[in-house]
C-alpha cells in the first residue's frame, strides 16, 4: 500500500516474502518452528521458575541466567509468531510502523543479550579467579547495575539504528525478501541515500561486537591462567564445568552473528541470511536452556523435585 505525498509516494505497508519460493515446505516448516518455539518458551520459563523456587540458585550466576532466559523468550517472540503466521496465511503484510517496531525490539534484545553474555563471562572470571570474595565482589547492587546497564545500552543502540532507518524514504517496492523486518532487507527497499544509516549501523555493530568479545576474551584468558595454576584436579574439573556451558552459548551466539556479517551482499546470499536468521532467532533461544541445564546438577535436581511434587499432587 502506498500513500501519496505530493509528487512522491510513501510505503505504509510491507509484504514479507518469507519462504515463498518453497511453498511445499510451508506445512512442515510451520510444524517444526511451532515445536521449537514451544520448547523455547517451556525451557526458558522453566529456568526462570527453577531459579525462583530453589534458594541454592539465588546467586549472581543464576540471576544473570534468568535474565538471559527472559531475553531469549523476548526476541524469539518478536520474530517467531510472525514467521508462523506467514507460513499458513496468504496475507503476509506488515504495517510500516509494525515493521519498524519489530526491528527496534529485535535489535534491542539481541544487543542486550550480547552484553549479558559478556557480563556472565565477567561473573565466571570473578567466581574462578577470586572465589573467596565472590559473593562480596558480585553484590546484589552490582548485579542489578550490570543488568540494568545492558538493557539501557541495548535500547539506546536500537533507538539510534531505528532512527537512522526512519530518516530514509520508502517509495516502493514494498516486498521484504525475508520473514521479518531485518536491517539489510529493510535497507534494500529505501529509495534515498542509505549511507548515513549504513555508517551508524556499522559503527554500532563493530563497537558492540568488539567490546563484548574483548570482555569475554579477557575474562577467559584470566580464567585459563588461573585453571592452569590450580594444584588439584577437583578444582580444575569444577572450574571447567562452570565455564563450559557459557563458552558453548557464546560460541553459537557470536558464531552466527559473524556468519551474518561475512555473507556477501548478493542476490544468492538472501537464502543464507534467512537461514542464519532462523538459527539466530528460533534455534538459539531453544538451545540456551538445554546448554545451561544439561550439565547442571542443581537445575536438574530442582526440575526432578518439581515434577515429583506435581505427580504426587495429581495422584492424591
Curated annotation (Swiss-Prot):
GO terms for cellular component: plasma membrane. SUPFAM superfamilies: Family A G protein-coupled receptor-like (SSF81321). Residues 1-28, 81-99, 167-205, 264-268 are extracellular. Glycans are attached at residue 7. The chain crosses the membrane at residues 29-50, 62-80, 100-122, 142-166, 206-228, 240-263, 269-291. It comes from the Eukaryota. The keyword Ligase does not apply. PROSITE patterns: G_PROTEIN_RECEP_F1_1, G_PROTEIN_RECEP_F1_2. It is found in: Cell membrane. The keyword Membrane applies. Keywords: Cell membrane, Disulfide bond, G-protein coupled receptor, Glycoprotein, Membrane, Olfaction, Receptor, Sensory transduction, Transducer, Transmembrane, Transmembrane helix. Residues 51-61, 123-141, 229-239, 292-316 are cytoplasmic. InterPro entries: GPCR_Rhodpsn, GPCR_Rhodpsn_7TM, Olfact_rcpt. Pfam families: 7tm_4 (PF13853). Disulfide bonds join 99-181. Signal peptide: none annotated. Its main location: membrane. One of its GO terms (molecular function) is olfactory receptor activity. Olfactory receptor. Belongs to the G-protein coupled receptor 1 family. This is Olfactory receptor 1165.
Amino acid at each position: 500500500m502506498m500513500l501519496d505525498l505530493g509528487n512522491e509516494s510513501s510505503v505504509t505497508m510491507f509484504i514479507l516474502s518469507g519462504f515463498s519460493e518453497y511453498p511445499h515446505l510451508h506445512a512442515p516448516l510451520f510444524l517444526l518452528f511451532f515445536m521449537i518455539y514451544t520448547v523455547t518458551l517451556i525451557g526458558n520459563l522453566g529456568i526462570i521458575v527453577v531459579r525462583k523456587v530453589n534458594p541454592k540458585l539465588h546467586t549472581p550466576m543464576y540471576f544473570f541466567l534468568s535474565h538471559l532466559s527472559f531475553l531469549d523468550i523476548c526476541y524469539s517472540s518478536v520474530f517467531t509468531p510472525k514467521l508462523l503466521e506467514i507460513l499458513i496465511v496468504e496475507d503476509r503484510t506488515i504495517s510500516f510502523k509494525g515493521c519498524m517496531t519489530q526491528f527496534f525490539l529485535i535489535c534491542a534484545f539481541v544487543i542486550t543479550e550480547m552484553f549479558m553474555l559478556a557480563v556472565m563471562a565477567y561473573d565466571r572470571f570473578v567466581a574462578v579467579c577470586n572465589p573467596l570474595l565472590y559473593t562480596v565482589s558480585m553484590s546484589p547492587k552490582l548485579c542489578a547495575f550490570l543488568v540494568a546497564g545492558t538493557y539501557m545500552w541495548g535500547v539506546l543502540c536500537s533507538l539510534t539504528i531505528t532512527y537512522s532507518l526512519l530518516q530514509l524514504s520508502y517509495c516502493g517496492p514494498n516486498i521484504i525478501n525475508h520473514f521479518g523486518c531485518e536491517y539489510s532487507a529493510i535497507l534494500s527497499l529505501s529509495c534515498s541515500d542509505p549511507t548515513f544509516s549504513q555508517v551508524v549501523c556499522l559503527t554500532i555493530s563493530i563497537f558492540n561486537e568488539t567490546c563484548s568479545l574483548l570482555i569475554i576474551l579477557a575474562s577467559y584468558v584470566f580464567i585459563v591462567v588461573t585453571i592452569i595454576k590450580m594444584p588439584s584436579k577437583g578444582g580444575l574439573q569444577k572450574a571447567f564445568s562452570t565455564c563450559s556451558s557459557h563458552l558453548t552459548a557464546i560460541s553459537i551466539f557470536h558464531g552466527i552473528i559473524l556468519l551474518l556479517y561475512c555473507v556477501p551482499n548478493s542476490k544468492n546470499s538472501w537464502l543464507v541470511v534467512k537461514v542464519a536468521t532462523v538459527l539466530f532467532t528460533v534455534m538459539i533461544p531453544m538451545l540456551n536452556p538445554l546448554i545451561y541445564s544439561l550439565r547442571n546438577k542443581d537445575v536438574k535436581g530442582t526440575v526432578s523435585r518439581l515434577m515429583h511434587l506435581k505427580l504426587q499432587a495429581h495422584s492424591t
